[in-house]
Every structure is written in C-alpha cells, then in structure tokens.
C-alpha cells in the first residue's frame, strides 16, 4: 500500500500513528546509530584482514561524521521542501548502497568511500523524525516522543556492541554489512509505503525564504549559547563511543573482544536510560 492509498489521517488512532509514523522513523535512527558506533567492535577485524592502522581507523570513523555533518544545512531545506518521508527514504537508499560498497571493499580507500555514503545516507534520520513528529504528535508530547526516538538510536548503539560481536561469530564483517544494506533498504521501503502524507510536512515557501529562515537561526543568540556545549560534548563522546573505547578496552584494559563488547554495551545502555529519562523529565517539567 502506497502513501497515496493510505486511509484519511482522521481515521488514524494514536496506536496507528505510533505504528505507521513513529516506528518507521525510529527504525531509521536505529540504523543510523548502529552504523555510527559499529567500528568500536569492528576495528580489530578490519585491522586483521586489511592491515589498517590507527590513522586509517580514525579517518574511516570520522568520514561518517564529515559527510553526515556537511549535509545538515541542505538537509533542512530538503525536509521543508519535500517532507521527511521522501527525503529520509531516498537517503536511506544511499546508505544501503554505501553498506554494499563497504562489504565489497578491499582497501582503506574503498572502505572510506562506503562509509562516507553511509554517513550521507543516514544524515536525515533524526531531523526527519523530528520534522514528522511535529505534525503528527501533540506539542505537549513532543519531548517524550523525541526522547523515545533518541532511545531508538541508543538501541542501535546497543546492537553495535555485544550483538555485533555475536553476529561476527556467525558470519564475517562483509556478511554483516550486506545484512545492514538489506535492512537499510527495507527501512526506506517502510517509510515510503507505511507513513501517510499530512498537511504541514511540506513548506510552501520558496528557496530564498527558506534560506532566510536558516540564516535567522545563525543570528540567534540562543543558538550560539547552546551550540558550543553541544559540539564539544558530542565530539568527545562520539569519538570515544564510536571507535576508541573499543581499542582502549582491548589493548589497555586487557579485555578480550567479547568482554570489551560487553563493556561498550553498558555504555550504550546508560545512554538509552539518559535519553528516556530526560524526555520524560522535560515532559513533566
């Protein structure tokens, strides 16, 4: 069933909104965070097979964030222009292509290109979710709903720890990324087929007005009060969680691969608890 054949919005109960709006977008952000943090567990396998060094691993991990971050400004314009469903579904198809390329890579350069495509492909997962939730959920519930979608990303981070280490006993990292490519394609398909259209998702403004609105954000004192703290905290945490915590636990703390993955699991679990707790706290206060 396509979005055009979906039942009228008025017939969607809250449970159906959760099933047909929240869950498809949450699945996308789950994959986004799984891709983001998987290198902490995957790195020794890449080193063993392809001979990557620490600089290669650092670049391989960071290129996800470079392509992800570089696309945020055009992403906002695209979300306003075409709506979150179309934009995120299209981008997730790029993530699927990137995962296929990563799975077939035989050099650091090929891995970097694949991961750059993955970063670009999942760059809209969180912002598209926020955009969709604004028009589908009551304003009073948005902090809690946003907390839940952030928690779905945390579940992706959980999946990138001990579950990935377990999966690597069943297959190799190439097979794992082939599976992730299929999951990315299915997530894109779910967005296209399950999520209905709703008035308010697409802006009627032309590109010039959209750009003026974007520039107004950069002139806001509130933006400049909050941005530095967000940048510093996210940069440090994501570099540790997304890569360097794994090698440190294995090479410095002396843990084996399974124990290191278990340690990363509890880091991600604490993050999920924080997402859920802060969302509920914001709703109640």
For each predicted feature, which ranges?
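Juxtamembrane intracellular "pre-TM" segments in multi-pass secondary transporters
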Residues: 6-14, 196-227
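Extracytoplasmic
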Residues: 20-54, 240-246
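Residue-level signature of mid-helix packing/kink "hotspots" within the transmembrane helices
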Residues: 37, 65-73, 157-158, 268-276
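Extracytoplasmic gate region of multi-pass secondary transporters
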Residues: 39-40, 222-268, 272-275
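Short hydrophobic/alpha-helical segments at membrane-entry points of transmembrane helices
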Residues: 109-115, 225-226
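Cytoplasmic helix-loop-helix junction between adjacent transmembrane helices
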Residues: 114-152
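Helix-loop-helix hairpin linking two adjacent transmembrane segments in secondary transporters
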Residues: 149-195
């Amino acid at each position: 069933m396509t979005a055009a054949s979906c039942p009228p919005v008025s017939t969607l109960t809250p449970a159906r909104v959760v099933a047909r709006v929240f869950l498809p977008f949450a699945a996308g952000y789950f994959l986004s965070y799984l891709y983001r943090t998987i290198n902490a567990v995957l790195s020794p396998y890449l080193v063993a097979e392809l001979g990557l060094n620490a600089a290669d691993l650092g670049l391989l991990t960071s290129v996800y964030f470079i392509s992800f971050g570089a696309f945020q400004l055009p992403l906002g314009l695209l979300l306003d222009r075409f709506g979150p469903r179309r934009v995120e579904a299209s981008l997730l198809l790029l993530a699927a292509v990137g995962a296929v390329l990563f799975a077939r890579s035989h050099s650091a350069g090929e891995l970097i290109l694949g991961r750059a495509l993955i970063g670009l492909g999942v760059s809209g997962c969180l912002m598209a979710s926020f955009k969709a939730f604004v028009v589908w959920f009551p304003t009073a519930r948005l902090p809690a709903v946003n907390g839940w979608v952030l928690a779905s990303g945390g579940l992706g981070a959980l999946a990138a720890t001990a579950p990935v280490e377990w999966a690597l006993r069943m297959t190799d990292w190439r097979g794992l990324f082939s599976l992730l490519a299929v999951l990315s394609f299915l997530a894109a398909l779910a967005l296209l087929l399950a999520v209905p259209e709703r008035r308010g998702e697409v802006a009627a403004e032309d590109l010039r007005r959209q750009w003026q609105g974007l520039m107004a954000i950069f002139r806001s004192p509130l933006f400049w009060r909050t941005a530095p703290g967000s940048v510093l905290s996210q940069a440090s945490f994501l570099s540790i969680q997304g890569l360097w915590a794994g090698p440190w636990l294995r090479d410095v703390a002396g843990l084996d691969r399974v124990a290191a993955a278990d340690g990363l699991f509890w880091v991600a679990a604490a993050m999920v608890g924080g997402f859920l707790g802060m969302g509920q706290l914001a709703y109640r206060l």
